[in-house]
Amino acid sequence: RIEAMFPTMIEHRCSEGCKGGFFMRVKEGTWMGHVIEHIALEIQTLAGMDCGFGRTRTTGDEGIYYVVFSYMEEDAGVYAAKAAVRIAQSLVDNKPYNLDEDIQNLREIREDTRLGPSTGCIVDEALKRGIPFIRLNKQSLVQLGYGIHQKRIRATIASTTGNIAVDIACDKEETKALLEMSEIPVPRGTVIRTEEGLK
C-alpha cells in the first residue's frame, strides 16, 4: 500500500544504500517510527521542500520511538510529522487518505513562512559555505554563524550597520522575544483593554 501511495519513495535509499532501499526495509520488517520518518520526508519533498535527513531510534519501550527528520520550515516540519502519523495509521487500517490535501497545506505553509527571495539567497549561499543559520523571527531576521563570528541580517541589511538594532529597539515585542530567546529574564507584558482585565 505504501508503494502505491508514494511511488516516488523508490528514491529513498535508506540504510540499504540503493534505489528502493526503503521499500526493501519495509518488506523485511521495520519500525513504524521508521515508516513515519520516511513519510514525513516524502510529503515535504512532494510539497517542494527537499528534505532528506531522518533517523529513528528506539526508546526501549515497545512501539515508542524517537523520530528525527529535517525540514526547511519549522511549521511545515511539525505539520509533516502529524500528517505522517495520520497517513501511517490510514495505511495500517487500509483506509483511503487524501494525500493531496496534506501536500497542498504544506505548500501553503511554505509560502506563508519561507524567507523572501533576497534573504533566502543569502541563507542558501551561507549553507553552501558550511555556515549555520538560525531564524530569529517569523520574518526575515536571521543569524549566520555562532559566537564571535555570528552576523545578523534582516532581508539584505547586515548587522555591520546600526539599522537592525534600531529596528529591533523600536519594536518592544520583538525586543522582548529576542531577549527571552537568549534566556534573559524579561517581564511579561500584556495589553489590558477592560477594567476586568486589571484584576
Give residue spans per PLM region:
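Generic alpha-helix structural propensity
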Residues: 30-31, 79, 117, 121, ...
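Active-site nucleotide/adenylate-binding loops and adjacent lid/helix of ATP-dependent enzymes
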Residues: 1, 151-199
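Flexible hinge/switch segments at interdomain interfaces of large molecular machines
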Residues: 97, 147-148
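Short polybasic amphipathic segments
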Residues: 140-145
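Long, compositionally biased, glycine/small-hydrophobic-enriched stretches that function as flexible linkers
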Residues: 1-102, 109
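Low-complexity, highly charged intrinsically disordered N-terminal segments
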Residues: 69-79, 85, 97-138, 157
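Short amphipathic alpha-helical patches
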Residues: 34, 149-150
